[in-house]
Each structure stands twice: as structure tokens, then as C-alpha cells.
Curated annotation (Swiss-Prot):
Major site of localization recorded for this protein: membrane
Keywords associated with the record: Cell inner membrane, Cell membrane, Hydrolase, Membrane, Metal-binding, Metalloprotease, Protease, Transmembrane, Transmembrane helix, Zinc
Compartmental location: Cell inner membrane
Catalytic residues in the record: E145
Protein name, as recorded: Protease HtpX homolog
Superkingdom per UniProt: Bacteria
Length: 290
């Protein structure tokens, strides 16, 4: 199972590209021309941080279609496809959101939802899910994904990622400037950032980026509990979602691209970077829910 959600990696790549462009345009030299300009740096960090997260959100749906080789169900060609579309429509109406696009992808049991807006989203299920679960269990999984959309989880995770990106960009450059100043103490001939600044910033971007990913993953796990409860509410009972989770716990875990893993029904097994709580914790939370 891949350990870090696709959204985080897509976001990191976008931020990295923005950082390279900013360096080529001389932003780093501007920020350190007369000492470190913290106000300008904060503005730069906000643009970089939220810019990367928002771009990642906006491209999440086309990226999901491309990376999963999704078969879109525009006009159902079989009773199963008609049932899937009908189930998504039923839950979307119940949740008060626009009808999502619906797709099927090849793979082990899994499903995901994505999209930048509640009324322009996507719900997809795998062939493995359809083959290994009862219709009631698949219905519960679809309800879970629709709940993600209705709860605005993609936007919420984007805002959290944006805050963490801003923290990483700002702090890495403050520390990088301090390291560079220490290494070049007594050298009055050089101006602008030196090699110490660039090396420190790159290393800290990576290290702090992983620390930020842990925080983002924690928030993602909390959203999973809400989506499970949302599925139970949409179905009017919690047993189908509990049955679906129990069955998922006994099946091979289907991998999703990192960009949509956070909005899937199952996620990575790593503790700190896991985007989903352990199956047994999710079942217990549903059992204890009123």
C-alpha cells in the first residue's frame, strides 16, 4: 500500500515547480537583499503554500481519471452500471449535492471520490469491490464516498495542506537564512543568498514536508470517521457500513494513486502517514455511535 496520499505528492510537485520558477525570477535574492524581509517572505509563503494546494485540488479530477484509467459511465450499458449510477444519484439527492460523475476502474477492492466542488465531483468504484461485496455493502461504500463530497473533505484537506505548505516554505527559508548568515559571518563582499541558504532550504523543504504530511494524514483519518458516519446516515442504518469495513479487512487492499488515496475507502497501513484509521477502529466508532 502506498503510504502518502497522492494529493500530497501532487501538491509537493506543484510547490517544487513554483519554487524553481520563483528562484529563476530572483525571488530569493529579493527576499534577502537587505536582510530577511519577513513580511515579504510570509506573502511569498502564502502564495506558494496555497497556490500548490489549490492547483492540486483543481486538477484532482482529471488526474484521477488519468491515473486510474477510469471507465466513465455516461450511459449505463448493463444492469450493474445502471444500479451504480442510480445509487450515486439517490445518495447525492439525499445529501443535497449535484450528481457526481461516475466511473469504474480495474483493481482490487477500493473506491474513491474527488473533485474541487461539491456539485462537480466524481465517484469511482473498482471491479474488485463489485465482485467481492454484496450490493448492500457496495451501497454503503458509495455512501461513504458521497459523504466525503457532502462534507467538503477535498476543500478542507486543501486548506489544511495550504497552511502546512505555508509553514514549510516560511520556516525553511528563515532557518536557511540563519544557516547561511552563520556560514558567511565576517564576509562582507558577498551579497544575496549563498550556497548555505539554498542547500539548507532544499533539505528543510523535504524534512519539514514529511512532518507536514504527518499532520495532514492525521486530519485525513478524522475525516474518514465522519464519512463512515455519513454513509450510515444516508442508508438509515450503520450495519451495512460495518459489514463493508469488515469485509474490506479480510480482502487484499486495493491500491489507489496517491492523488486520490485520501478520499478512498481504504488507505495505507503506516501509522504516522496513514490516510485512513485501522479498520477495527472505524468499526468500533460506528458501533459506539448513537
Amino acid at each position: 500500500m502506498k503510504r502518502i496520499l497522492l494529493f500530497v505528492l501532487t501538491n509537493v510537485m506543484v510547490v517544487a515547480v513554483l519554487g524553481i520558477v520563483a528562484s529563476l525570477l530572483g525571488v530569493n535574492r529579493f527576499l534577502t537583499a537587505n536582510g530577511l524581509n519577513l513580511t515579504a517572505l510570509l506573502g511569498f509563503a502564502l502564495v506558494m503554500g496555497f497556490g500548490g494546494a489549490i492547483i492540486s485540488l483543481l486538477i484532482s479530477k482529471p488526474m484521477a481519471k488519468w491515473t486510474t484509467k477510469l471507465h466513465m459511465i455516461d450511459n449505463p450499458q448493463s444492469p450493474d452500471e445502471a444500479w451504480i449510477v442510480g445509487t450515486v444519484r439517490k445518495f447525492a439527492d439525499k445529501a443535497g449535492i449535484g450528481m457526481p460523475e461516475v466511473g469504474i476502474f480495474e483493481g482490487e477492492p477500493n473506491a474513491f471520490a474527488t473533485g474541487a466542488f461539491k456539485n462537480s465531483s466524481l465517484v469511482a468504484v473498482s471491479t474488485g469491490l463489485l465482485q467481492n461485496m454484496t450490493r448492500e455493502e457496495v451501497e454503503a461504500v458509495i455512501g461513504h464516498e458521497v459523504a466525503h463530497i457532502a462534507n467538503g473533505d477535498m476543500v478542507t484537506m486543501t486548506l489544511i495542506q495550504g497552511v502546512m505548505n505555508t509553514f514549510v516554505v516560511f520556516l525553511s527559508r528563515v532557518i536557511g537564512y540563519a544557516v547561511d548568515s552563520f556560514l558567511r559571518r565576517g564576509d562582507d563582499r558577498s551579497s544575496g543568498p549563498g550556497i548555505g541558504y539554498y542547500v539548507s532550504t532544499i533539505v528543510l523543504d523535504i524534512v519539514l514536508g514529511f512532518a507536514a504530511a504527518i499532520v495532514v494524514a492525521w486530519f485525513s483519518r478524522q475525516r474518514e470517521f465522519r464519512a463512515d458516519a455519513g454513509s450510515a446516515a444516508l442508508m438509515g442504518q450503520k450495519q451495512p457500513m460495518m459489514n463493508a469495513l469488515a469485509r474490506l479487512g479480510g480482502l487484499p487492499a486495493g491500491e489507489l494513486p496517491k492523488a486520490v488515496e485520501a478520499m478512498g475507502i481504504t488507505g495505507s497501513i503506516g501509522k504516522l502517514f496513514a490516510t485512513h484509521p485501522p479498520i477495527e477502529e472505524r468499526i468500533a466508532a460506528l458501533q459506539n455511535a448513537r
